[in-house]
């Protein structure tokens, strides 16, 4: 199953990009990052089997185990792609939110795009390591 991060804005080079790269390289699943301009630009076409997850302040706050369980369920259901959208500075409007299969939040705080991307990459690594039985995650 493809893990596809689609983010508004360019990350460039720097410590945030290095952190994203570090976690993406650890993930044992196919992973792709698509960067779009802050405004405009088209989302890649969405196949019917694609799960759409929007990072949104109004989203559900999931612990790492619950997030891993969702990924595992989608994988086991034969989903080909889980697409994670990181919006522009103003986030998503209500019409866009209705298109999502899951609205996902990293708590109630607002996070800069670069940190949100790094946090998502880390959570994807953590979730896939949980599903693989790797000892990286310690619940408790």
Swiss-Prot record:
Keywords: Cytoplasm, Methyltransferase, rRNA processing, S-adenosyl-L-methionine, Transferase
HAMAP family: 23SrRNA_methyltr_H (MF_00658)
UniProt-annotated location(s): Cytoplasm
Residues involved in S-adenosyl-L-methionine binding: 55, 87
Enzyme class at the top of the EC tree: transferase
EC numbers for this chain: 2.1.1.177
Gene3D superfamilies referenced in this protein's UniProt entry, alphabetically: 3.40.1280.10
GO MF term set: rRNA (pseudouridine-N3-)-methyltransferase activity
Reaction equations catalysed: pseudouridine(1915) in 23S rRNA + S-adenosyl-L-methionine = N(3)-methylpseudouridine(1915) in 23S rRNA + S-adenosyl-L-homocysteine + H(+)
Protein name as catalogued: Ribosomal RNA large subunit methyltransferase H
